[in-house]
Amino acid sequence: LIVRSKENLTHLIPEVREELEHLANLQVRDDELRFVFDPRYREYLTPDFRRFLGLFRFDMRYVHVSQENGQIAIRVRGPMLHCIMFEIPVLAIVSELRNRTKYPDAQLSQVRDRLYQKFEWLEKNATKEELADFRVSDFSTRRRLSQVAQREVVEVMSRDFPGVFVGTSNPA
């Protein structure tokens, strides 16, 4: 993790470590494996990858959280197969902990209001034809305010987005 701002996140180190430890307890459940083995998804997930999901566990030996140059530093080093799986959860954890501290009073109503303001702007500045071709997907897991807020955004987008909402990268 490279923090590109001057915002000091070192106070998050204990909570980041605690949340990362929870990852080590995660594993794909049997019902989830049945879901990914559904024939409808055959073209998206190879049999080897589906079997891999059943075996995979986050290995905390590869994650190092420290303070460097007055900033939080998170390094994941080890076999690529294991390290790449940490990227999104690590970024989501840091983002959510940071936002919980920075915006402790944030409300879902504020998230919805801001989203509807953006919808209004789009409707005012784009034609119906442009909106009919305007396709958007949600990829905000790494930078979301919170999981609850992201769920709300996805629900509102799927129901009320004036263009074409394609879906989300985060089905959970």
State the predicted function of each range.
Residues L1-A172:
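Ordered alpha/beta subdomains of enzyme catalytic regions
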